[in-house]
């Protein structure tokens, strides 16, 4: 699992790219899906939980086609990433 947050110029524009071109690219790098959250305190902040291992994520962010895709989606900042450190049963 990978948790990422970023700020975007326009959520609808970002979501259009995230759910199409970016989804295809993520799948190519092993992503099995994602959950998207909007921040209630910052209208331009998006949080995403990816069903993705660290190697797949690293492969994705190292792909030279990704930075132009992020720019096209309207990212205002570079995504900040946290990796799942553990999972508890309750």
Residue ranges of predicted features:
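An amphipathic, aromatic/His-enriched active-site/gating alpha helix that lines ligand/cofactor pockets
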Residues: 16-35, 53-84
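Short, surface-exposed ligand-recognition loops at beta-strand->loop->(often short) alpha-helix junctions
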Residues: 7-18
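Short, low-order "capping/linker" segments at domain edges
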Residues: 84-90
């Amino acid at each position: 699992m990978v948790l990422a947050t970023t700020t975007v110029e326009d959520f609808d524009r970002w979501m259009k790219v995230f759910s199409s071109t970016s989804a295809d690219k993520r799948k190519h790098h092993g992503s099995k899906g994602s959950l998207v959250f909007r921040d209630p305190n910052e209208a331009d902040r998006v949080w995403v939980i990816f069903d993705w291992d660290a190697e797949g994520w690293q492969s994705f962010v190292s792909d030279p086609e990704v930075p132009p895709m992020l720019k096209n989606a309207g990212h205002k900042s570079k995504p900040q990433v946290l990796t799942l450190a553990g999972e508890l049963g309750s």
